[in-house]
């Protein structure tokens, strides 16, 4: 992708040498000519060559040939963030080469896909905070390019689309960013890939963006904030329906931060390689929600595919509570209903397995703790640093080990609690050393 070209301490000569080396070895690089890496690499090369005012015909010839190939290989078959990246890159190529065909095609793609992919509350429709931040940065870069190069192309309508969409995306991002600056690691999200929220906010402000916090809606994500505790809940749908490749089987999962530190966490992702680890990281039991028997809510398979899927419905919500159900176990005649009630000193979670007929089998509720947190069990009570968990309706409770992913190929063992129940489970999380206002 050549993202390293954007490093402030990278010497111009080293960047040039690496570009030369890449061009020389391109025939041996199996995936380098795929449209997605070509798109990202093109943007990074244009930025690097422009910032350093490098004019080399060999670079330009190769880069232009790559853009001609990209024009014929736009990723209509993959759609989603790939198609937006194709469009953004073609716009950069159009400005760099003053090529109307590149620019017009890129503008067409971006105009159509922004309207398709950005939800009403500002979330990117793949519902991954990581990809949301990546695409927001790309949008800000494109807005910067369009705004400051009107001698090349000028389109007030397109500029306004970028500005208005950017405001919505910034608003959503601020609404789901924790006080410690991190974002929820839901669906395919992990650290060290995208820019931090604060970096994007600062960049947007330098470009003249102003935005207000909007109410979270379509994404299904909610973030409850107290003086010392933050509770993120996921009542979103598998999204989008026609390309759910980055979705997990995680309906009604949640994340709990206490005094700015993670306590109950999403285990995250460590690989995109299709296999056991990828399957496990997308499964219901790898999230803080309920699994009926040994069945996932949504049938994740093949690394990036989803079969039958849970559809979440929010039935009631307020400033400190949310209630809903999903149909992921409909084929067994069961609906899972989950209610969160939030206040400054405690959180109550009520799970009901609503059956049309007699309920057969048991369910498991999972609670994954951040590495380093000591977890102790006392009857139906869990003791951890910062909070206690009490369970009503549990058949049994046990502590298990799981693999927490700090990032790609970077994992660590941690503790989880599995609570077995039949029809109804009430979990009360009591926060220590917190006084009600």
Language-model segments: which ranges?
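Carbohydrate-active enzyme catalytic cores, enriched for enzymes
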Residues: 123-269, 313-317, 323
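Residue-level detector of short, conserved catalytic/binding motifs and their immediate flanks
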Residues: 2, 39, 252-254, 288, ...
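A residue-level signal for conserved active-site and pocket-lining positions in enzyme catalytic cores
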Residues: 4, 90, 173, 351, ...
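Short, solvent-exposed loop/turn segments at the edges of secondary structure
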Residues: 85, 247-251, 285-287
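Aromatic-lined, polymer-binding surfaces characteristic
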Residues: 1-166
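Short alpha-helix boundary/capping segments
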Residues: 33, 38, 244, 248, ...
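CBM-like, beta-strand-rich accessory domains located in the C-terminal region of large
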Residues: 272-437
């Amino acid at each position: 992708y050549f993202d390293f070209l954007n490093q402030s301490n990278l010497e111009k000569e080293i960047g040039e040498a690496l570009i030369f080396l890449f061009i020389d070895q391109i025939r041996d690089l199996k995936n380098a000519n795929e449209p997605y890496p070509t798109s990202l690499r093109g943007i990074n090369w244009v930025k690097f060559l422009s910032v350093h005012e490098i004019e080399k015909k060999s670079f330009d010839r190769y880069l232009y040939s790559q853009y001609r190939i990209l024009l014929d290989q736009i990723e209509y078959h993959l759609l989603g963030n790939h198609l937006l990246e194709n469009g953004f890159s073609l716009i950069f190529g159009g400005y760099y080469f003053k090529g109307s065909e590149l620019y017009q095609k890129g503008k067409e793609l971006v105009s159509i896909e922004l309207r398709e992919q950005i939800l009403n509350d500002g979330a990117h429709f793949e519902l991954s905070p990581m990809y949301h931040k990546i695409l927001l940065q790309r949008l800000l870069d494109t807005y910067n390019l369009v705004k400051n190069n009107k001698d090349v192309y000028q389109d007030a309508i397109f500029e306004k689309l970028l500005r208005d969409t950017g405001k919505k995306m910034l608003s959503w991002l601020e609404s789901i960013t924790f006080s410690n600056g991190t974002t929820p690691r839901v669906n395919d999200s992990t650290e060290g890939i995208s820019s931090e929220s604060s970096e994007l906010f600062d960049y947007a402000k330098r470009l003249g963006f102003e935005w207000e916090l909007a109410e979270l809606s379509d994404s299904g994500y909610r973030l409850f904030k107290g003086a010392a505790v933050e509770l993120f809940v996921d009542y979103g749908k598998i999204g989008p329906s026609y390309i759910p490749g980055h979705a997990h089987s995680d309906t009604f999962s949640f994340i709990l931060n206490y005094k700015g530190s993670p306590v109950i966490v999403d285990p995250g992702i460590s690989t995109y390689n299709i296999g056991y680890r990828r399957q496990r990281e997308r499964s219901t039991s790898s999230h803080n929600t309920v699994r009926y028997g040994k069945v996932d809510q949504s049938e994740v398979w093949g690394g990036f595919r989803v079969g039958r899927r849970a559809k979440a419905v929010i039935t009631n919500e307020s400033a400190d509570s949310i209630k809903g159900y999903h149909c992921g176990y409909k084929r067994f005649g069961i609906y899972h209903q989950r209610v969160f009630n939030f206040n400054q000193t405690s959180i109550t979670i009520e799970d009901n397995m609503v059956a049309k007929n007699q309920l057969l089998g048991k369910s498991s509720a999972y609670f994954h703790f951040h590495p380093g947190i000591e977890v102790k069990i006392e009857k139906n009570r869990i003791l951890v640093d910062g909070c206690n968990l009490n369970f009503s309706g549990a058949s049994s409770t046990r502590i298990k080990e799981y693999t927490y992913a700090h990032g790609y190929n970077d994992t660590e063992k941690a503790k989880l609690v599995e609570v077995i129940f039949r029809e109804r489970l009430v979990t009360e999380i009591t926060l220590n050393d917190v006084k009600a206002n």
